């Protein structure tokens, strides 16, 4: 007998540690949420809905596309060039995981307010 104390039960990691840097950024989280609701949306709709500039929207869509969270398709509506964004299965999974973590954070916050 060494007299060592038993290992304390390990607590699960704090939900904030699991937040995804790519998804959690405000504009990208908003884009994924809008695309999850709409399924597919064109650049103009996203720009108008989220009050973004062309450059800002383009950059955030590129980041999401690079991570495989959205698919960007370019084409034409009549003679006008158009870009459409669609959330991918990976994007849906990432958004759902982020929302679960945010819900866990909210639960912890609300539990702390009752004390």
Language-model region placement:
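Accessory beta->alpha helical hairpin/"wing" motif in late/C-terminal subdomains of nucleic-acid enzymes
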Residues: 87-91
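Short, hydrophobic-biased segments on the C-terminal half of alpha helices
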Residues: 61-62
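Glycine-centered, phosphate/nucleic-acid-interacting loop/turn motifs that mediate DNA/RNA or nucleotide
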Residues: 68
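Amphipathic alpha-helical dimerization/coiled-coil segments
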Residues: 2-16, 33, 92-115
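Short beta-strand "wing" residues that participate in macromolecule-binding interfaces
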Residues: 72
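N-terminal helix-turn-helix DNA-binding core of bacterial DNA-binding proteins
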Residues: 14-56, 75-86
């Amino acid at each position: 007998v060494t007299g060592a104390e038993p290992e304390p039960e390990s607590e699960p990691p704090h939900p904030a540690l699991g937040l995804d840097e790519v998804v959690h950024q405000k504009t990208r989280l908003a884009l994924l949420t809008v695309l999850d609701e709409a399924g597919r949306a064109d650049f103009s709709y996203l720009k108008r809905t989220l009050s973004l500039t062309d450059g800002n929207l383009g950059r955030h869509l590129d980041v999401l596309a690079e991570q495989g969270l959205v698919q960007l398709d370019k084409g034409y509506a009549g003679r006008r060039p158009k870009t459409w964004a669609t959330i991918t299965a990976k994007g849906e999974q990432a958004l759902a995981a982020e929302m679960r973590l945010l819900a866990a954070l909210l639960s912890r916050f609300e539990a702390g307010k009752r004390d």
